[in-house]
Amino acid sequence: MPTDTNSIIALSKSIGKLAREFENGATPSKEVQQALVLASEQLGVAAREPDDNVYNISGQISQNAAIRSAIALNAFALMPEDGSTITVEDISTKMNADPELVGRILRACASAHVFGHPTVNEYCHNNLSRVYLQGDHRQLAAQIYDFTGHAVLAIPDFGEEKQWKSMGDYVRGPFQLGFATDLSYMEYLQANPQRLKSWNSGMRTGKIGHRTSAFPFDRALELDPCGKDGIAIVDVGGGRGQALEGIHQDYPNLEGRLVLQDLPDVIKDAKANGLPDYIETTPGTFFDPLTAKGARIYHFRRVFHIWTQTKALELLENTKNAMNDYSRMLIADMVLADVGCERDLAMQDLNMMSLGGMERSESEWTSLIESAGLVLKKIWQNDQGPKHAVVEATLPTFKGHGLE
């Protein structure tokens, strides 16, 4: 019998109460949805025997291997989209693969609720497996398994090697140990065009590539205008310019110049892939002195999590040198809770640990910003929660308008 009977009863009541928020076609808040997910996960832990919980957690590696194998076999695309069943023999023929092997992989996926398994040797799509019909989601799953996975698995060995005093950095850490390479992870990606293509495709998914919708760009630039010839936004490390394009789409009447800064090859790729003419470009690394000085906004999207505190501080100080008394620094990144951090955010921090970076909690962001002699004005949260927060910082001498 489960050993946590009291929790089972309490959590069941809580889930029932939260579930009523979904009745009659209502759309609950993000907070209600997150509370329901958390309570459901806690109920699963309480309902299992303690030993079963250990085995369930340990087996998640095999679950991911099954899904990755299904992607390699193209099972998601070959499964009938209308939800009708297909036999193992039929789908194996389409895959040109051994039926017994395919059946075992599909069985493992279905046990994790990816695919339905209504009858013997027959499988079908369900709501979860249909998510993988979108190619970018398959690319993301493959990217995390193939790339981050090897690095994460090396964390314990690297920690032992360093006697748990350090987890290394961008150029020497679990990633280099896991892949037996001296290259940084970005150099490793760029050395293989197909690997880089897969990475970029995975990064386009909504949960990873969401733009900075939490911050009121229009209000900030209306209160502190830069004029049509002034620099409104510099997107540092902005890749193909997706964030600037998104901001322009959301706020088409913004006045001022939009500038993309990234490595020369990245900018060349951006232009080859249709970078709009309204976006100017300037080549440079994160740590080169910024040539676009006195911009109203210096924007960093999913950049700081690449770096440890030491390099992040260097990046802040480099940007600080380009700012004036009307400049804002916007850091679009995750903000982890100091207490009760969500599991996927905590696991993402370990993903970044394996690559030599880190996700940061609110107190860690505050400490980092203040150590650079900057002022943390506000952490902006949008309706997607802490996965898509924006940290706003300014010089202590800031003369612009507050947005609170």
From Swiss-Prot:
O-methyltransferase; part of the gene cluster that mediates the biosynthesis of dibenzodioxocinones such as pestalotiollide B, a novel class of inhibitors against cholesterol ester transfer protein (CEPT). The biosynthesis initiates from condensation of acetate and malonate units catalyzed by the non-reducing PKS pks8/GME11356. Pks8/GME11356 lacks a thioesterase (TE) domain, which is important to the cyclizing of the third ring of atrochrysone carboxylic acid, and the esterase GME11355 might play the role of TE and catalyzes the cyclization reaction of the C ring. Induction: The expression of the dibenzodioxocinones biosynthesis cluster is positively regulated by the transcription factor dibT. Pathway: Secondary metabolite biosynthesis. Gene3D superfamilies: Vaccinia Virus protein VP39, Winged helix-like DNA-binding domain superfamily/Winged helix DNA-binding domain. The active site is at H305. SUPFAM superfamilies: S-adenosyl-L-methionine-dependent methyltransferases, Winged helix' DNA-binding domain. It comes from Pestalotiopsis microspora. S-adenosyl-L-methionine binds at G237, G238, D262, R301, R302. GO terms for biological process: methylation; secondary metabolite biosynthetic process. Its EC number is 2.1.1.-. It comes from the Eukaryota. Keywords: Methyltransferase, S-adenosyl-L-methionine, Transferase. Pfam families: Dimerisation, Methyltransf_2. This is O-methyltransferase GME11366. One of its GO terms (molecular function) is protein dimerization activity. Belongs to the class I-like SAM-binding methyltransferase superfamily. Cation-independent O-methyltransferase family. It is an enzyme of class 2 (transferase).
